[in-house]
């Protein structure tokens, strides 16, 4: 509907230029927004105020000219008025709003989608957990956010590649191997022989047991059979990484999250990509030796101080392989890359971007883009839950999904902006009441399905979209529903382009609330066949949009609850 109003204003301006009542000939960016106050109409346009300087006229005078040149051929507009300094306020006819129901019925599961990103490629990297233990709730929030961003971008036409980067190299992996070896040898955590910084969760015992039993693990492109030798640390490392990759993959599949590409950090070293990046930076003159270490002049690219790339012991700091990895992304042709990560990665952003700029490879500043999510606090009975027996020191994603279910877990993870801290109330997530946000939305869908069952039991046949007498609609509750339904495509596009999945959860809760309000105040099946048919069509469209919205979140839309 906004587009229709925008087109009306644009055409009015073109007619004004043609007859000379406006002289500049410049059509501004026509902004149409929903007014803050309902009494100001359905839409407000600021074009007159934006044109005042170029036209050398008062905004209200320009607004009057625009209004007189409007040609509402399709009878969309009920009234137009000038407000304040020059806002043009539009109130739309009920018949215009009801057109959206025909569109929803025509497009069905595609309603909300667009081609805004058609022909464009984007790579989204998310989760990218170290294969050193079970996925924790922070990984879970990142998985929900990243997966939904992918769904949203795909919905508006982008060609999306989902990627998981396995940090299977470095000291953490060495600590993992030593921890599993200790368990293989019967060493208990806390004892004098337990490795420094060893992993203490119960899952380490599971890995050790499987290794000693010479089990075979398939994880992605890895097929590893355990050697069973407790003294072969390298064999233990290979098996442990594959074992935990498999565990993480299983948890993600259960969470309805999948990937197109799994990229191993170890491959960067095996192919010499890390060394190559360092040599290229040196050759470009952006590195120097000091105190036995190799430094990158990150201050040349906006950092507050230079950073060490290669330590005095010859090992690389953690951001150097990240630079090599992102160069690889660029070389694979991904002009747009989005990294969804925990907020603890914030410090690496400037360093990675500086390293990429130092390569002088044509990579634009500010590449890649980042979405950082804040921590999750899990509450039960008013107290924070911190420990998982299996993981030893944190709550796992599997713990949460097993207790409250996939739908509630995903929806709750997506109820706040990524950069806002999230309190996950287990008790609320398990409630089958309208106080539970995901239940509230799903129940609206199930309730609509039950209305159609009831109609069928009474022999009421819902009309087709062409048969329905939509002019019968007009109560405040009906109009609220229709207006919300019409805004769904805009909500989807805004959520996608701004990487803000929480907008969908907000919208669905508002839509469910509007439905419940309608249902409490209006009978659906009445003695008036035309009104019954129109209301059934309205509810069918509402169910379609709820289902489409939940699908974008990776949440089911049950027909019975």
From Swiss-Prot:
ATP-binding as UniProt keyword: yes
Protein origin, superkingdom: Bacteria
Top-level class of the enzyme under EC nomenclature: ligase
Claim: Cytoplasm is one of the keywords in the record: yes
Key words of the record: Aminoacyl-tRNA synthetase, ATP-binding, Cytoplasm, Ligase, Nucleotide-binding, Protein biosynthesis
Subcellular location: Cytoplasm
GO cellular component, one term: cytoplasm
CDD domains reported for this sequence: Anticodon_Ia_Arg, ArgRS_core
EC identifiers of the protein: 6.1.1.19
Pfam families for the chain: Arg_tRNA_synt_N (PF03485), DALR_1 (PF05746), tRNA-synt_1d (PF00750)
One annotated GO molecular function: ATP binding
GO biological process, any: arginyl-tRNA aminoacylation
NCBIfam families from the UniProt entry: argS
Family: Belongs to the class-I aminoacyl-tRNA synthetase family.
Name under which the protein is recorded: Arginine--tRNA ligase
Gene designation: argS
């Amino acid at each position: 509907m906004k587009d229709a109003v925008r087109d009306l204003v644009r055409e009015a301006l073109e007619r004004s230029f043609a007859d000379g009542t406006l002289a500049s000939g410049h059509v501004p960016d026509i902004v149409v927004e929903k007014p803050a106050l309902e009494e100001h109409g359905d839409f407000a346009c600021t074009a007159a105020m934006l044109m005042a300087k170029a036209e050398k006229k008062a905004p209200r005078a320009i607004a009057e000219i625009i209004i007189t040149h409007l040609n509402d051929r399709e009878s969309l507009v009920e009234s137009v008025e000038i407000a304040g300094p020059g806002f043009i306020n539009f109130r739309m006819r009920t018949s215009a709003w009801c057109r959206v129901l025909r569109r929803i019925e025509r497009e069905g599961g595609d309603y909300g989608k667009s081609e805004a990103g058609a022909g464009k490629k984007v790579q989204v990297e998310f989760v990218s957990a170290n294969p050193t233990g079970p996925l924790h709730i922070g990984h879970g929030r990142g998985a929900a956010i990243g997966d939904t961003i992918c769904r949203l971008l795909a919905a508006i036409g982008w060609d999306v590649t989902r990627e998981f980067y396995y940090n299977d190299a470095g000291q953490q992996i060495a600590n993992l191997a030593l921890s599993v070896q200790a368990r293989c040898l019967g060493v208990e955590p806390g004892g004098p022989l337990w490795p420094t910084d060893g992993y203490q969760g119960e899952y380490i015992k599971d890995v050790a047991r499987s290794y000693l039993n010479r089990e075979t693990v398939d994880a992605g492109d890895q097929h590893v059979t355990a050697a069973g030798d407790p003294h072969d640390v390298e064999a233990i490392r290979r098996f442990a990484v594959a074992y935990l990759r498999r565990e993480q993959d299983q948890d993600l599949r259960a969470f309805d999250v999948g990937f197109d590409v799994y990229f191993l950090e170890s491959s960067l070293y095996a192919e010499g990509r890390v060394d190559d990046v360092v040599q290229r930076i040196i050759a470009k003159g952006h590195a120097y030796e000091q105190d036995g270490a190799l430094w990158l002049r990150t201050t040349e690219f906006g950092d507050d101080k230079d950073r060490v790339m290669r330590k005095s012991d010859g090992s690389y700091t953690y951001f150097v392989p990240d630079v090599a990895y992102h160069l690889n992304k660029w070389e694979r042709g991904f002009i747009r890359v989005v990294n969804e990560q925990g907020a603890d990665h914030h410090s690496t952003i400037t360093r990675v971007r500086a390293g990429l700029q130092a390569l002088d490879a044509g990579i634009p500043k500010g590449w890649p883009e980042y979405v950082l999510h804040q921590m999750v606090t899990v509450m039960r009975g008013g107290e924070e839950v911190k420990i998982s027996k299996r993981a030893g020191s944190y709550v796992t994603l599997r713990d949460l999904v097993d207790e409250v279910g996939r739908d509630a877990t995903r929806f709750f993870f997506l109820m706040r902006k990524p950069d806002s801290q999230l309190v996950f109330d287990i008790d609320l997530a398990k409630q089958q009441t309208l106080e539970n946000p995901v239940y509230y939305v799903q129940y609206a869908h199930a309730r609509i399905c039950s209305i159609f069952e009831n109609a069928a039991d009474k022999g009421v046949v819902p009309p087709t979209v062409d048969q329905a007498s939509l002019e019968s609609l007009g109560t405040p509750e009906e109009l609220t529903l229709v207006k919300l339904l019409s805004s769904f495509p805009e909500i989807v596009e805004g959520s996608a382009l701004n990487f803000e999945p929480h907008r969908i959860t907000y919208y669905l809760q508002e839509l469910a609330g509007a439905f419940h309000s309608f249902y409490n105040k209006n009978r659906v099946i009445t003695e008036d066949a035309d009104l019954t048919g129109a209301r059934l069509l309205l509810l069918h469209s509402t169910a379609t949009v709820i289902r489409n919205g939940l699908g974008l979140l990776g949440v089911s839309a049950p027909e019975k609850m």
